[in-house]
Every structure is written in C-alpha cells, then in structure tokens.
Amino acid sequence: MAKNKLLVVEDDAGLQKQLRWSLDAYEVVVANDRESAMAQLRRHQPAVATMDLGLPPDPDGATEGLALLQQILAASPDTKVIILSGNQERAHALKAIAMGAYDFHQKPLDADTLSLVIARAFYLHAIQQENRRMLQIQSDSRWAR
C-alpha cells in the first residue's frame, strides 16, 4: 500500500532530517522555501503539508510563510496545512489559522503529538474527499432519472 504524501516546508536542515525520521509512516517530500514548496505541491499533490512560517528570505518574520500559505490554499484548497510555530510566532500562527491553515503545532516539536495532528489531517482530508465523491454520485443520479 502506498504511503500518504506529506509536504514538509522547513528551511532548517536539521529539523528537516528530524521530521523525515519521525514521520516515516508517510512519504515525506521536503521543500526549503516558497518556490520549491509550490513546485513540490504541483508535482506530488500532497493531502497534508507542514510548514514553518519563517522562510527565506525572511526567516525571522512570517511574511514569506503567510504568502506561501495563501498560495498553497489557492492552488490546492483541500490541502491541510499545519503550521509549525515557535513561541514568539503564536500571533502569526493564529493569523495563519484565520487564513485557512488546518492547525498549528508549537516548537520545539513533540513527534508523537505532531504525528497525531498529521494523522487527523489525513483522516479529515479522506472524509472530505469521500463526501465530495458521494455528493457527485447523488447529483449524477438525480440527472439520470
């Protein structure tokens, strides 16, 4: 059975490695900036993504991360985006939720908790896809009468 694809957007190589190791139940696709994240999103079409808001060229701010969130949700509205946030970024994480992010997880990361949040995001995505499919079948059967 194929593993679910998870996009991890993180510019810290050490954290990328930690996430790849701790999330080995998924096919982890990594990006380290907005451009590579969008390329990976188009190429792999992951159902779930985790992302740091502090991405280059603004690693200490959130402008690049919030812009990427907006792009991801515009290109793939069903993708569940989980924000990985440091304590000083809490206000930015809440803004990201208001913009449409699925959830956020505080750094430093707790692998078990993050795994549960990610599993829940994949589950919700699958339920929403199934619901859409059933609504389409129902709609098609009305027209077939």
Residue ranges and their predicted role:
Residues A91, H105, L109-I118, A126:
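C-terminal output helix
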